[in-house]
């Protein structure tokens, strides 16, 4: 859940927002598996970046028309991950029998929404200046708006402790790869 600038590892207590409640219920539903002595892993995925669907795809259009910007204040944290790292991390967890319990699948370098917007603008050669007001997001998305207005500063601590290496640990390298925009 939203805890401002607090770094949230897998050991952090859950929040009380929509996404936190959903995660608690989802993970509780697997308690029987663990009680039976079967290894299980719960994946707490960050926003998986894709230029063709999901959050990134929706962000691209306003940036391409020079009207991109942060959601609300822009101070909320964004836990994100490149799809190649998401797949590699899942495979890593399958192949490492000592892995069990919850794992944050997100890049080790989270950004605020405003910082992510500036990086996206830089990669696209576009400004990041026009914020989307929080009230408009709440009106359009209802309770789900909390997922973009509150965010989490999540860190994949357990994954890092097991030795997983991210191919795209920072947003700029991830976005350049996904959008076909190599550094010039």
Language model segments and positions:
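Non-catalytic, hydrophobic alpha-helical segments
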Residues: 86, 90, 105, 116, ...
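Glycine/proline-rich active-site loop of Rossmann-fold NAD(P)-dependent oxidoreductases
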Residues: 4, 23-24, 36-38, 49-58, ...
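Catalytic helix-loop patch of NAD(P)-dependent Rossmann-fold dehydrogenases
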Residues: 2-42
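Alpha-helical substrate-binding/gating segment
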Residues: 31, 60-69, 75-111
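Alpha-helical membrane-targeting segments
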Residues: 58-80, 122-151
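C-terminal amphipathic/interface module of NAD(P)-dependent oxidoreductases
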Residues: 146-184
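Glycine-rich "substrate-gating" loop/helix at the edge of Rossmann-like oxidoreductase active sites
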Residues: 14-19, 46-52, 73-83, 94
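Mid/C-terminal beta-alpha module of Rossmann-like enzyme folds, strongest
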Residues: 96-143, 176-184
């Amino acid at each position: 859940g939203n805890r401002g600038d607090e770094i949230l590892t897998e050991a952090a207590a859950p929040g009380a927002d929509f996404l936190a409640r959903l995660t608690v219920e989802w993970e509780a539903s697997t308690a029987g598996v663990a009680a039976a002595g079967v290894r299980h892993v719960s994946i707490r995925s960050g926003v998986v970046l894709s230029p063709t669907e999901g959050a990134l795809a929706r962000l691209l259009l306003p940036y391409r028309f020079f009207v991109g910007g942060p959601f609300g204040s822009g101070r909320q944290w964004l836990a994100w991950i490149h799809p190649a790292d998401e797949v590699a991390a899942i495979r890593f967890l399958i192949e490492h029998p000592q892995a069990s319990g919850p794992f944050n699948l997100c890049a080790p370098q989270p950004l605020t929404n405003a910082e992510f917007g500036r990086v996206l603008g830089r990669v696209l050669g576009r400004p990041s200046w026009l914020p989307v007001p929080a009230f408009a997001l709440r009106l359009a998305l209802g309770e789900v708006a909390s997922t973009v207005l509150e965010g989490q500063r999540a860190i994949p601590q357990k994954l890092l402790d097991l030795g997983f290496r991210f191919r795209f640990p920072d947003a700029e390298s991830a976005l350049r790869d996904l959008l076909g925009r190599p550094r010039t």
